Design a protein with these regions (language model features):
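Actinobacteria-biased recognition of intrinsically disordered, low-complexity terminal regions
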Residues: 1-21
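Residues within well-formed alpha-helices
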Residues: 55, 89-92, 116, 129, ...
Length: 173
């Protein structure tokens, strides 16, 4: 999760009538692709972080400690691993920075799978529910992608007519 300092951009969260000074604490959880081999290694020396990551691993029934510290790139790119790993990393790093950080945040958001971490942080559902949800979501998406090469496809940019022609040529809808 990325903590984005303060902002002077006018928004509802910085409205003085709502008790805000004008500074806004926004926490944004990343989506799949933010993970790198060993990206959690340095965090493991922090007891708050390592305890939370171990607990989240147990809840998800996935060894997220190993995946965040020693698993190779191919392993952590697997959607079934990457998604629970990213949600757990977002929650554990934020709690390590400040155990009360989510209650202090003015804005919580997430990109793609990061929305699950943001939802748990906002109290929309429990942390345990978030970890079970993201585990099942990751497994389902990995299974769908393994059945058909184009079952999990995204188009980023390009000329609209060319993109539509390519989609049609591939037999996709």
């Amino acid at each position: 999760m990325t903590t984005v300092g303060t902002s002077s951009v006018p928004c509802l969260a910085s409205d003085p009538s709502r008790g805000h000074s004008g500074d806004v604490l926004a926490i944004v959880a990343p989506g799949q692709g933010a993970q790198k081999p060993g990206f959690l290694s340095d965090w493991m020396s922090d007891a708050t972080f390592s305890d939370h990551l171990a607990w989240l691993s147990a809840v998800a029934d996935i060894d997220l400690v190993t995946h965040g510290t020693t698993s190779d790139e191919a392993t952590i790119k697997d959607t079934a691993v990457a998604q629970p790993l990213l949600v757990a990393a977002a929650l554990a790093t934020a709690w390590s920075v400040d155990p009360e950080i989510f209650s202090q945040a003015d804005l919580l958001a997430g990109h793609s799978v990061g929305e699950i971490a943001a939802g748990a942080a906002a109290g929309a559902f429990s942390t345990e529910a978030a970890m079970v949800l993201v585990r099942e979501r990751g497994r389902a998406m990995a299974e769908a992608a393994s059945r058909t090469a184009t079952s999990m496809t995204a188009v980023i940019g390009g000329d609209a007519d060319e993109v539509l022609t390519a989609i049609k040529a591939a037999g996709l809808t």
